[in-house]
Every structure is written in structure tokens, then in C-alpha cells.
Amino acid sequence: MKSAIKKVIAACVVCGAMVTGLSVPVTTNVEATTIQAKKQKKSASKLEIVDSGYYVQPTDEYSDTAYVYFWAKIKNNDKKKSIDFPVITVTAKDESGNVLGSSSQTGMSIAPKDTVVLTSMMDTGDTPATTVEIKAKKPKFTSRKAIKSNVFETTNITEVPQEYTCAKLTGEVTYKGKKDLDGIAITAIYKSGDKSVFAETTYLNDIEAGSTEAFEINPLSNELPDHDSVEVYVQNW
């Protein structure tokens, strides 16, 4: 392991504020956001894409398949009802507007006035995508209570360089709820200035109430785009 480990000192807060570390500052969890992204106009569905992005990995000497990594930060603007199984859809096109592929990602739930992040990837054959369209489908509201993201707290976030692959992100997450969970999703959004440039998610199973668990996120991409900050989000899964 290289000695120059990028260490990020994350504040022990639930709603993350940007924290200046030794190299890459980290934002933990949901409601406070460090970006000044242009928010999409709220639709009648009350499901808002707060931020979204994609990263295109072209073909190279090791792979004749191109990939698109995509993500969307989505907010439930309803004050009383939760959203069950939120869905984002993705369409990748070439420079002529021809569709290279389409995909979707489905989440678990979003509590009222809460925000979660959905991520995934897709291949576009041997042609790298030129444009990628990301949309949120009309949500399904429910009176069932959803786990809020502010019951999770992340600490000790660190970017660890690796010899043959891009740096992994490690840290710890504390669950402050009172009921055990089947699992959680932990997402890192890599930022360059105000722009999100990459995102990756990992999952942990069997989370006990009051427990603290270590995690690591190993990006599947061959390399990470240049970035100067990382936001970490946790949700029930």
C-alpha cells in the first residue's frame, strides 16, 4: 500500500457539513448539502431530482465494452407520506441521438422531506455514450413509515490508495435507530467543485440497533475522475 494515504477527518454529525480534511473533505448524510446545484422544478409528484450525473468509461486495451455509471439524488417533498420503491430511469445516446442502451434503478423508500441517492451502471456495447438522460418516475406514496436517513452517522472516512486499482473509500457507520435492519446502502458521491463526477454504492446486511459497522467502497471503474471532495449518504435497504 502506498504510504501517501489520503485521510479525511469527518465531523461526527448527522446532517453533513463540508469538513476540511488533509486532502478530500467529506459530507456525511442528507439534508445539508455542500453543492449549489440547479434544482429541477418541483413536479406535482413531489419527487425531486436534486442532483444527478454520470461517468462514461470508454473501451480500452483491457475491455471492448463501454460503460456508463449513473446516479441521482432524489428528495421526497411530501410532508406526510413516504415513497415506496422510488425509480430512476436512464437512457444513453450516441452523438447522433441513437439510443445505445437504457436502464433503471429502484430504491427502497424515502421518508417525508428526506433525500436518498440511487446509483448503478450499464454497458453501451463498444460505443461510448455522448449524452445520458436521467429521470425519476412518478412515485408511489404510502402512509407506511420509512426509516429516515438521519438515524445514520458516518465517521473516519478515508480514501485509501491501492496499487493496481483506484482508491477505495473506507469508514464507519453508526445506526442510531431502535429496531434492527435487514440492510443498509452506503453511497459515496465524488465531487469536483460543485459538480458530481462519480458515485458508487456498497451494502451491509443485518444491522443491529445502536451498532457501528465498518465499510469500504471499491469503485468498479478503472480509474476515478479528478475530485476534491466526497459526500457520503446512508439509507435503509
Where are the model-predicted features located?
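Intrinsically disordered, low-complexity Pro/Gly/Ser/Thr-rich segments with frequent PxxP/GP/PP motifs
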Residues: L100-T127, V197-E223
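Bacterial N-terminal signal peptides that target proteins for export
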Residues: K2-C12
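Asparagine-centered strand-capping/turn motif at beta-strand->loop junctions
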Residues: I74-K80, V173-K178
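Short acidic/proline- and small/hydrophobic-mixed sequence motifs that coincide with surface turns
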Residues: K80-F85, L100, A129, K178-G183, ...
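Short beta-strand and strand-turn-strand segments in soluble, beta-rich domains
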Residues: D84, D94-S104, K148-V151, G193-T201
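Terminal connector regions
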Residues: D123-C166, N222-W237
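Short, solvent-exposed loop/turn segments enriched in Ser/Thr/Gly
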Residues: T65-A72, Y164-T170
